Amino acid sequence: MPDATGLQPNEVDLDLFDVILDVRPSRDSASAFPGARHVTLDDLVKQPARYLPSMQTTTLIVCDVGQRSGVVAARLADDGYRSVHSLIGGIDEWRAQGKPLVHIGLTEAEAGRYDRQVKLREVGVRGQSALLASTVTVVGAGGLGLPVIAYLAAAGAGHLRVLDPDIIELSNLHRQPLLPLADVGSSKVAAVARYVASVNPDITFTGLEVELNAGNAESLLDGSDVVVDATDRFAARYAISDASHALGIPVVTGAVYRWEGQLTILEPNGPCYRCLFPDQPSEIEFDCAITGVIGPVVGTIGTMQAVEAIKLITGAGSSIAGRLLLFDALSATSTSVRVSRRDSCSVCNPPT
């Protein structure tokens, strides 16, 4: 592959690129570049490590006519990224030379159902099509998982996979208001399956009554575009983080304690959950069956997890990755703190 930043369409072999990024500002194009992830130019410039795992990542950047992609590719090259290329002439020239593009479109029913979010510039037809093509695995169908599942189903996430081995107990209902009293005693997965079918029968739902652990996490999460950690056990959170890091899948993780909640995204290039919490906290100390929890706080964090998952899939806005959001309902305050990879982390920086 040429070392120059710019590549002509006839010089591009898509199979040779680790990452392809589309920095076009519009989300309403009827076609997409093959294998490309849509990102905003501003987000790519400010957070390149979110999209390029290393300085050696072989990357192609595309836009409409090659100007925006050329500017950002040159800037990334100046910053030390050694194999970043821009498509000369952009997608317009790619199309003019008869190169393949991926058709994007919505059916009349889809356009009507998702009209209000498609109208958002950050979503558009392309973002909605990405949602419809996505596979999201939600681990946990309780107080955090239910609002995630509800909003992703309503938004049109094409394939929802939900993992939870538990049954519904009466004490669950104060933080799981979508479930009727009649569902007490039913499996959470079965109850959620009924709910999703009633809300959006057009998406695919896969429910597994299985407990995720370090031994099965990779096989259960493989194939996901996004994983949502909605569990209430630290052992499961570490297993989700470790497996997703190995698979290269981003994780939206949230947790609640009494009146407080927290939220972040664990990107494949770190920091991971072990960077945030190197020593596993006590399961008993943070068990809501012992400490208690207020229902709306759980719903708030779960809803925010759904928002971040949608942003990841559509490429909208700025990611919360690298920041830990802390919410305190009693004081009605929220703050965010910067988090980074730990040099001693065995997952992000394994010994050589």
Where are these regions (language model features)?
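A short acidic-Thr-Gly-centered motif at the start of a beta-strand
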Residues: P9-F17
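Non-catalytic regulatory/accessory regions that flank a structured catalytic core
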Residues: S86-G90
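Acidic, glycine/polar-enriched metal-coordinating patches/loops
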Residues: R82
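Adenine nucleotide-associated cytosolic modules
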Residues: M1-A4, V19, V23-R37, L41-T58, ...
